[in-house]
Each structure stands twice: as structure tokens, then as C-alpha cells.
Amino acid sequence: MALPPARTLYAPGRGELFLRDTGGDGPPIMLLHGWMASADLNWWGAYGALVDAGYRVLAIDHRGHGRGLRSILPFRLSDCAADAAAALDLLGAAPATVVGYSMGGAIAQLLAHDHPETVSGIVLSGTAHDWQDPRERWFWRSMGLLWAATAVAPHWMWRIALGRLGFRDPDMASWLVSELLRASARDIAEAGRELGRFDSRSWIGSLGIPAAVVVTTRDSIVSPSKQRRLAAAMGATVFEASIDHLEVVKPGYVPALREAVESVAARPLEASPWASAGAP
């Protein structure tokens, strides 16, 4: 599996930011990953297809996730959005099309709202404009238990979870576990609680930029109906992928994602040199 080149940027007042950057002169896309994941875990199945379509692909690891920034401050979604904005500015890649999955969708919404000069279009998937219904609020309140589990027995917990998701190849499972173990248990738990507090309903319809939503139609974590309500609130074009929430690496997801990106992004130019140097 080939991954795009890694970059570490120093953002004054923030710290070191880790991201993937395929380079090239294509329209920039910033990929924002989901909760507990890293950029590579969420997006490795999509990197090659987006580069082949002519885009410059950027994918940041959020605070407390993967190789992302570690801070003594509590995890805040708004800080993740500010980190992404800083990376785009430092790279001269703003404004970019921003693509957010799950928690990354909440961060993408905040990025477009709080840093509008950095965003030219937005694609959301497997996400919502709030998680306020009783079942969701109960789930997010349980994040202290998750923190304890990931801190006490992380290898055991992740290997069981991956086995249930059908990852049987030992090399792939080892890589996935190694990526998951990079995360900070404290930040993971706090990120979950932050999601429980997130609510963009009062302003999501006022972003005024091209928007698309890829609805994960078999999603057991973020209901498809809630994803459609988000799309309606934004006036976004709807695309569909017949997957559950944790199946973004399945073949059916990437074509829908690429179509959604093409519906809002600037016209692609020549592909990045990375495309011919090792894209999957």
C-alpha cells in the first residue's frame, strides 16, 4: 500500500502539524478524518482515486489522533478546524475543497464557518449537524469508559474490534492497530464528548459555498435520515454509498466520494507526480 508523502508543518502559536500532501498543481482538497482514526486509516482507499482525478490531496491528522499535534489543552473541534486552516495557509493552498467524514464532518463545518477564506467548497459524509437525540447523548456520555478501555488494554480492544469488522489479514490488521495506537486516550475520549456538544443547526444553512453530502445508506452510527437532514439544511447535492459507517475502504464508497468532490471542486488540472510514483 503506497501512501502520499508526509509533511510536518510548524504553525506559530499552535505547534507541529502532520499531514499527507501529494503535491502537484491540481485544485487542493483537504481531507478531514473521523473520530479515533488517522488520515491514513480513513482515506488510504481514496488517495489514489482523487489524485488520478487531478487533485492535490492534503490529509491532516487531527489533534490527539494519529501523528497529530499533542496539546496540554482539552480537545476542541474548533481547534482542529483552526489547525486545518493554518495548514492550508502555510501551504498556500487556500481556498480548498474540504472533505469531512464523521467527526471530520463536524470539523469541516467549523472550518467553513470560522475560517471561510480557506474553504471554496465542502463535501460531508457519515456526519450530521448535531448529535443531540437521547440515544446519541447517552453514547457520548459514556466516553469516560472508552478512555479507560483504550488506556488499560488498547491492543486487546482494537484487535477484537478489527476482527469483528472482518479484517483478517494479519499484516493489514497489524498496520491498522499500530495506527490506532498512535492516538491519545484522553483526547479520544474528550473528542467524543465534544461531538456530543456539537450543534451547527443555527448556522449551517448560511455557509454559501458549493456543498455535497455522501450519504452512507447502511450507516448504523449516523443514521442516513440524519445525513439527509444535514444535506437539506445546507442545500447540498446528495450522493449515496451503500456502506456502513466503518466501511469507507470498501470499493463502493470511493466512486461516490469522487463524484461528490467533482460536483463542488474547481476543475482538475494535471495529476500530481505522486500519481505515477506510487499511488495505489
Identify the role of each PLM range.
Residues 249-263:
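Post-His helix in hydrolase/transferase enzymes
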Residues 100, 104, 108:
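Gly/Ala-rich beta-loop-alpha elbow adjacent to hydrolase catalytic centers
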Residues 98-100, 125:
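Short beta-strand immediately N-terminal to the catalytic nucleophile in serine-hydrolase-like folds
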Residues 44, 52, 58-97:
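Active-site loop/oxyanion-hole signature of alpha/beta-hydrolase fold enzymes
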Residues 15-67:
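Conserved HGGG/HGGXW glycine-rich cap/lid loop of the alpha/beta-hydrolase fold
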Residues 109, 113, 121-150:
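Flexible "cap/lid" loop of the alpha/beta hydrolase fold
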Residues 211-244, 250-252:
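Conserved loop-alpha-helix segment in the C-terminal half of the alpha/beta-hydrolase fold
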Residues 133-134, 151-205:
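Conserved alpha/beta-hydrolase catalytic His-Asp/Glu region
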